[in-house]
Regions:
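Alpha/beta-hydrolase
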Residues: 202-292, 299
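The serine-hydrolase catalytic nucleophile loop
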Residues: 80-92
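Catalytic histidine-centered segment of alpha/beta-hydrolase-like enzymes
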Residues: 311, 338-347
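Conserved alpha/beta-hydrolase
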Residues: 95-114
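Conserved alpha/beta-hydrolase "acid-adjacent" motif
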Residues: 310-318
């Protein structure tokens, strides 16, 4: 009797294994077909990836557009050093009717890690110099006199500085989840959280301990407490995205499994600390590049921000107040539902905003 039961169990397990193996094979076939389909080059368009020599380093970019004659948009990811190329290609496809979109993994990260990892800290000057060098390369390679910048989160402040310092190189600057001045944003964050925790004595007392003059890393425990107790806006990227995150990851034409693993799961904590000089969040870069008192732009300025972006570094109130002070040949603002990542998650609204910008530039 026992032998009969064991045989049945083995048979069931065997069939379960066959079914699982079959599902894996089907998923891999779907991935292969999807990658091939989305890696096609549009007629009259462009679809390329390459490693560019930038200031003594190799840095990965992808270039995609439906028409080579369209203007060029360079996306500068946030972090710092948090490329989204493992899943963001679907966002840029939505912009590709109006712009040839260049997605850039900055030095030492994304597709560049670990093969082209850096061995010493990256400074704000390095970041700005890389942005200028890549701009010059793209203008030469794609036959343009100028390009448009789109910087998100930490790198919104780099995009703004590049446009402020080198208006001759840019048609416009678009910033999302804008950092204006990190210390001021931390001050406003404290005010916001004091109001949010007024009926929670324990967390209210914790918020009172926040010193806006100190970096997040010096007060990490308080911010973690706030997050653990629900006092932080954390997007559900799978529910809120206006494109399929699963498809964007699984059928990504620009990433292998290994590259996606390195970008999503690899523990780079010690590497990050080395790169940022000990500040894993990299606030020092933002402090050096504050644009609080730099509101005179010689190029059009456009802001897209989540209405509920109460991230400690990108408080929506600070971003909107800065926008109101900006003087530029043209400016516009798009507030979308959601928090810190919503300028990318709400990619249909981003595409409509970018289309509007493109129409103005014609």
């Amino acid at each position: 009797m026992v032998k009969i039961v064991l045989k049945r169990i083995v048979k069931i397990l065997k069939w379960i294994g066959i079914v699982i193996l079959g599902l894996i094979i089907v998923l891999l076939i779907i991935r292969c077909i999807g990658k091939m389909y989305y890696n096609r080059t549009p007629d009259g368009g462009i679809n390329e990836t390459m490693y560019v020599d930038i200031n003594g380093t190799k840095q990965w970019i992808s270039i995609y557009g439906q028409d080579k004659d369209n203007p060029v948009l360079l996306y500068i990811h946030g972090g710092p050093f948090a490329p989204t190329s493992w899943a963001d290609w679907g966002v840029w496809r939505k912009l590709s009717a109006d712009f040839t979109v260049v997605n850039w993994d900055q030095r030492g990260y994304g597709h560049n890690y670990p093969k082209y990892r850096v061995t010493e800290p990256i400074t704000a000057d390095d970041m700005i110099a890389d942005g200028k060098a890549l701009t010059d390369f793209l203008c030469d390679y794609l036959g343009k006199e100028k390009i448009t910048l789109f910087g998100h989160s930490m790198d919104s402040i780099y995009a703004a500085n590049l446009a402020l310092d080198h208006p001759e190189k840019y048609d416009a600057v678009i910033v999302g989840a804008l950092i204006v001045d990190e210390q001021e944003s931390r001050r406003r964050y404290k005010e916001y959280q004091l109001a949010q925790t007024v009926n929670d004595p324990e967390m209210h007392a914790a918020v009172e301990q926040i010193d806006p003059a100190k970096e997040i890393t010096e007060q990490e425990e308080i911010y973690q407490q706030l997050m653990a107790n629900g006092y932080a806006t954390i997007e559900d990227i799978f529910a809120e995205a206006e494109t399929s995150i699963v498809k964007s990851i699984w059928m990504n034409p620009y990433c292998t499994f290994g590259e996606q693993y390195n970008m999503i799961f690899a523990d780079t904590t010690e590497y990050d600390k080395m790169v940022t000089g000990g500040s894993i969040h990299g606030e020092a870069y933002g402090e050096q590049l504050s644009i609080a008192n730099r509101t005179q732009y010689q190029v059009p300025f456009y802001l897209i921000q989540g209405k509920n972006d109460h991230n400690v570094g990108t408080m929506v109130e600070v971003a909107v107040e800065y926008y109101e002070k900006v003087e530029a040949p043209d400016k516009d603002i798009c507030l979308v539902e959601g928090g810190h990542i919503s300028p990318l998650l709400c990619c249909d609204q981003l595409a409509a905003f970018v289309h509007k910008i493109d129409e103005k530039q014609k």
